[in-house]
Amino acid sequence: MEHNYEWGLEKNPANYSPVSPLEFISRAAEVYPDKLAVVHGKTKRTWSETYKRCLKFASALKKTGIKKGDTVAVMLPNIPEMVEAHFSIPLCGAVINALNIRLDPDSISFMLQHGEAKIVLVDREFTSVISQAILRMENPPLIINVEDEMYSGPGEKIGKIEYEEFMKKGDDSYLGEMPEDEWSAIALNYTSGTTGNPKGVVYHHRGAYLGALSNILEWDMQKHPHYLWTLPMFHCNGWTFPWVIAARAGLNICLRKIDAKLIFDLIREHGVTHYCGAPIVHNQLINAPEEFKRDIKHKVEAFVAGAAPPAAMIEGMSVLGFNITHVYGLTEVYGPASVCAKQESWESLPIGEQAKLNARQGVRYHLQSGTTVMDPETMKQVPADGETIGEVMFRGNITMKGYLKNPKATKEAFKGGWFHTGDLAVLNPDGYIKIKDRSKDIIISGGENISSIEVEDVLYQHPAVLLAAVVAKPDEKWGEVVAAFIELKNGSTVTVEELVNHCKHHLPKFKVPKAIEFCELPKTSTGKIQKFELRKKVNSTEAIDV
């Protein structure tokens, strides 16, 4: 039955419009037209210039036949055209599919076919992969070449038209298209498939809008930040930060590849205020030569996510004067969707204790409805005792629409009205989540559960260790035992026995690694350690009796 607050109070264009992060760039161009939006080498563009370019490129896409719901893929590093693509593609109603630049031709070919990409924007460095990928396709997409002034390496142009030339096809008068429904798709991101084909995660305009606002709120981000692109924009659309920086009319400082010296140089040159990255990026900065780090006299804010960060890494960055905020999430929740919100009471603790508290996965984002740890069988929240293990689950607006063309996987992921992450965690008495492991990373030795993260944290405390990864090694007696792969810092040495003794001082005997191998660890393009590669070789690791 209709009540008084429904009668005659219908939605109309004057009192309602679907939300979209596309609103951010139009406002930035309107209110701060002359503020720098992007810098990359000699290229500098204002928000007014950037918005005009995005609209013109969107118009060119439309003239080429791209329509609402079509997919336009991009295989680009962190360059200005990648920033523009996050606006120009959805401004014509299409969906942006940012491809992982580290993937092989078979994986890229699958994604292009599964997502039905009509056009691919490709940087010359990656044309070899794209050219091989489209050979496997019945209906190859139109290729648009993107030339970066900062790249002088190998690679042939394979497209029929250049990015700038294509843009000229667009109309200067085009105003862009806002979504009629905020539930409309804005982006397609593929999960890294360690088994089988990757799944296509679909984002909606509402989630992208609220995810961006949540990042601003969690960081207390002021107007006009100077944001350094250490995080790949192909990873969860740069955790929504192309839209975040537009919302704050900030400066996008592009970075083609991770290089510690260049990062410190850019921090000094452009007064970088914010950046994001996986623990491996921060480790590179901590362990960079001291001369790289000189004369940084302002506070730099950093988000860290990806693999659970060791407390030693957070402590090390704090010593450098970088304020680290630990966030947690997955592709399916637009990147970060929970934060280890810092409490004033922690400030009086020793820095090591602060680092341990900050290493937790924390609490839900402002605009995410729920983040907790639940028993996946009963779908009840686990006790907040810091001991009972359950599965981390999310629900709310910062959660994907679902998996493209995969209703079975979508239904399974949303079972019980929550998104199931597959991450195993405990709920602490203060309500903060602490991940113990991915469900597949828990090591069960003689009936005892061993968290690989716990063992890795101890290994990271050794001064010679740069990176550590722990996996299960099959064992006839115990079922599984702990195997550790170690990448050492440059110039550092340590023996297997020394590392084992170090672990014995901090862990019960059954958790101490029974096999250790020194090597360069395999990593994804975002710096995550590829444990599935380590599991393949685990049977060949050096055996140690402990």
Model features per residue range: what roles?
Residues 364-393, 429-430, 492-496, 530:
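Conserved beta-loop-beta connector loops within the AMP-binding
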Residues 46-49, 186-210:
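Conserved AMP-binding A3 loop
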Residues 16-17, 22-26, 34-79, 83-87, ...:
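Conserved AMP-binding/adenylate-forming core of the ANL superfamily
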Residues 24, 63-64, 91-168, 490-492:
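Structural core segment of the AMP-binding/adenylate-forming
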Residues 209-226, 234-274, 288-289:
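Conserved AMP-binding/adenylation subdomain of ANL enzymes
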Residues 103, 120-122, 275, 396, ...:
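AMP-binding/adenylate-forming catalytic core of the ANL superfamily
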Residues 247, 272-277, 286-356, 369-370, ...:
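Gly/Ser/Thr-rich phosphate-binding loop
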Residues 33, 144-145, 159-161, 167-190, ...:
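Conserved pre-ATP/AMP-binding loop-to-beta segment of ANL
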